[in-house]
Structure formats: structure tokens, C-alpha cells
């Protein structure tokens, strides 16, 4: 169908992108966010070509990428700083990757949604949806739509009550996050304006410039690592594991700690049931090792809007959408899930393994771009 009415549940990256993409194709769209305002955790995010193309498609690129950061490379290093693997980005003819503040991205998506005519309803908690397009709310009210998009996150109520079977892996690893403002902390012998990932035993430190003055740090560890899980980071323990990074830990001292999150992987038996589509982390959550969580959500959202608008009916469009987007997104998931293994192999093997996984990452990203362009 060319257009109709859609109810979108979830005011995150996937939900806002889907709502805007549908509205731009002539749909009337109402978006529901259970919180009292559209907001997000204030950390950094990587956006690759597929996400950048989606932002451009919905008119959110200019505002979203204002003050975003483009580094020339991402280098994976041993705990002593030795390079193990390097990915060149933002070079002529190569992959593009920008980093930015997550709240800047959400803000731009929110503005784009309102400009497109989306009705944004905050404090509106959907509790279930059925195959005929009926959405029920915590107030006891309900509404019906031609299309329902369940983009309510990894703990999705709508997905769980829709009856779709799925596999959910709660991983041992997770991350605590810190934003550092001001002059970048000095790392001996390294370009602090590049992205770096340091590996030391079961721990990783991701160092990500996000703007000219703000740097995002992700402290990745197992969920039983007492130096990382809890109300405060034990930065002395991290300094013992990564002595080269003492200036980074000094810069992080006293900064607000963004909540610990365990990494998860979710795969559904199907991405839709009747007139209900499941999108983003609710459908294909993945650990952040290849930086594609947000990109795949935006990529999938724009593809969804195109498929249902260009098909004879909604259910046919949802089938076409899944057939086109699921294979490359699951390839990105698989690559990201395999990246967890780096922490459990001897250091001498990490370089060759990272090379193999890096080639898989490049292949997965390339497929996402091709599929998005063909949608």
C-alpha cells in the first residue's frame, strides 16, 4: 500500500527513524514513548555508511552530524600499546565512520520526526500489540493501525506478548561508560585524535573522540569484574592492567559514570506477525564490537518504510523487508558476537584473529550498504 496509518512504539533510534521515514512517504504516524520525554543515555556512538545514508534519507544528517567527529583510523592495540590491527576509515573511496554524542543523534531524529509531521506522544506506555494492528496501552485504552512498529528495545513488551519465538543470549561481557570533556588525555606515542581499543586479559578500553572536545570511554569487562561493575570504577585496578593509559584514567576520575549494561544478542524466528513489525534492539540486538547497533536500526527502519509503501499490502511489504535486510544484519550480528572471543585467546593469536574478524566486519558493513541502496 502506498500509505496508511502507523503506530510506532519506542522513541529511540529505530523508532524515531521508522516514524520519520513513514511520514515522509505519506503515512500518518503516531509515536509512543513511555518516558516523559525523548532522551537517551549520554554516551558516544559510532555511525557507519549505512547509518549515515539512513540519516540523509530522512533529512536528519545536517543536524545530527553537526560537531560529529571523523577520525582517520580505528586501531586495536595490546595493553602496552602495540598495534594489533588497524581499520582505515574516512579515506577516499573507503568506508566512512563518524562518532558523535548519542543525545545529539536522538535530538536530531526527534526534530526530523516532528518536521515530517509525526505526532510524538511521551508518557504513553504501550503494553501489547496484536496481529490485526491493535495496540493496547497501560491506561486500558487501545487503538488500531494499518501498521504497528515495535521498537521498544531489548526488553520489548510488545515482542514478548506477540508470540514470536526468539533466542536471547545475555552475554558475560558488558560496559561502563564515561564521557571526558576538555583537552584529550595524553597517551605516550599515540595520536589521541584517533580511535583506539586496548585489549588486556578479559578487559578492553575503548577510547573514542566524539567531538572536538569530548571523548567517550567504554570500560568493557565481564559482569563479575568488581573493578568495573558497581557504582564506581576501580581506576587503580584498570591502571595496573593498562599502565600506558594512566593519563586517561586520571582524566576519567570524578566524572559521572554512565550505567553498566550487559551485552545481549537477540534473534527472532520472524521479524513480523500480521501487521506488527519488530525493529531495532527488540529484533536484532547485538554486542557493540562492530559499532552497528544504531546503524542497523536506522538502516532497517528506512528499509521498512520503503517496503511497506511500495508493496500491495502491509504483510507483503513486511515479508519483502525481512528478506532484504535480515541476511546482512544477521551477518553483522554474527561478526560482533564472534568479537567477544578476543578476550579469551592468547595475546599471540589476537593479531591474526582480529585480521580475520576485521575482514568479516568489512564484508558485513559492505553488505549492509548494498542492501540499503537496493531497497
From Swiss-Prot:
It catalyses: 2-heptyl-4(1H)-quinolone + NADH + O2 + H(+) = 2-heptyl-3-hydroxy-4(1H)-quinolone + NAD(+) + H2O. GO terms for molecular function: 2-heptyl-3-hydroxy-4(1H)-quinolone synthase activity; FAD binding. Induction: Up-regulated by PQS. It comes from the Bacteria. SUPFAM superfamilies: FAD/NAD(P)-binding domain. Keywords: Monooxygenase, NAD, Oxidoreductase. InterPro entries: FAD-bd, FAD-dep_Monooxygenase_BioMet, FAD/NAD-bd_sf. Its EC number is 1.14.13.182. Belongs to the 3-hydroxybenzoate 6-hydroxylase family. Involved in the degradation pathway of the Pseudomonas aeruginosa quorum sensing signal molecule HHQ (2-heptyl-4(1H)-quinolone) to anthranilate. Catalyzes the hydroxylation of HHQ to PQS (2-heptyl-3-hydroxy-4(1H)-quinolone). This is 2-heptyl-3-hydroxy-4(1H)-quinolone synthase. It comes from Mycobacteroides abscessus (strain ATCC 19977 / DSM 44196 / CCUG 20993 / CIP 104536 / JCM 13569 / NCTC 13031 / TMC 1543 / L948) (Mycobacterium abscessus).
Amino acid at each position: 500500500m502506498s500509505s496508511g496509518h502507523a503506530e510506532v512504539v519506542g522513541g529511540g533510534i529505530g523508532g524515531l527513524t521508522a516514524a520519520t521515514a513513514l511520514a515522509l512517504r505519506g503515512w500518518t504516524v503516531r509515536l509512543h514513548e513511555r518516558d516523559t520525554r525523548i532522551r537517551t543515555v549520554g554516551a558516544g556512538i559510532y555511525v557507519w555508511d549505512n547509518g549515515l545514508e539512513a540519516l540523509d534519507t530522512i533529512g536528519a544528517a545536517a543536524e545530527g552530524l553537526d560537531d560529529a567527529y571523523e577520525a582517520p583510523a580505528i586501531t586495536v592495540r595490546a595493553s602496552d600499546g602495540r598495534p594489533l590491527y588497524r581499520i582505515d576509515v574516512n579515506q577516499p573511496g573507503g568506508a566512512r565512520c563518524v562518532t558523535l554524542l548519542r543525545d545529539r543523534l536522538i535530538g536530531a531524529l526527534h526534530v526530523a520526526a516532528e518536521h515530517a509531521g509525526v505526532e510524538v506522544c511521551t508518557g504513553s506506555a504501550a503494553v501489547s500489540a496484536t496481529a490485526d494492528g491493535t495496540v493496547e496501552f497501560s491506561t486500558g485504552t487501545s487503538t488500531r493501525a494499518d501498521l504497528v512498529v515495535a521498537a521498544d528495545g531489548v526488553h520489548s513488551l510488545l515482542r514478548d506478548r506477540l508470540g514470536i519465538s526468539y533466542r536471547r543470549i545475555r552475554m558475560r561481557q558488558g560496559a561502563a561508560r564515561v564521557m571526558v570533556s576538555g583537552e584529550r588525555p595524553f597517551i605516550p606515542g599515540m595520536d589521541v585524535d584517533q580511535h583506539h581499543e586496548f585489549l588486556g586479559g578479559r578487559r578492553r578500553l575503548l577510547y573514542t573522540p566524539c567531538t572536538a572536545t569530548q571523548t567517550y570511554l567504554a570500560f568493557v569487562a565481564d559482569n563479575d569484574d568488581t573493578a568495573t561493575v558497581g557504582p564506581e570504577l576501580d581506576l587503580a585496578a584498570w591502571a595496573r592492567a593498562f599502565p600506558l593509559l594512566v593519563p586517561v584514567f586520571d582524566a576519567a576520575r570524578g566524572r559521572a559514570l554512565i550505567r553498566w549494561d550487559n551485552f545481549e544478542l537477540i534473534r527472532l524466528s520472524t521479524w513480523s506477525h500480521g501487521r506488527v513489525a519488530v525493529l531495532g534492539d527488540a529484533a536484532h540486538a547485538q554486542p557493540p564490537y562492530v559499532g552497528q547497533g544504531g546503524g542497523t536500526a536506522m538502516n532497517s527502519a528506512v528499509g521498512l518504510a520503503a517496503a511497506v509503501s511500495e508493496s500491495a499490502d502491509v504483510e507483503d511489504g513486511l515479508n519483502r523487508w525481512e528478506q532484504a535486510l535480515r541476511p546482512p544484519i544477521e551477518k553483522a550480528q554474527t561478526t560482533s558476537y564472534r568479537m567477544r572471543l578476543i578476550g579469551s585467546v592468547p595475546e599471540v593469536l589476537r593479531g591474526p584473529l582480529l585480521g580475520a574478524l576485521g575482514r568479516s566486519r568489512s564484508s558485513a558493513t559492505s553488505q549492509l550498504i548494498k542492501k540499503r541502496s537496493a531497497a
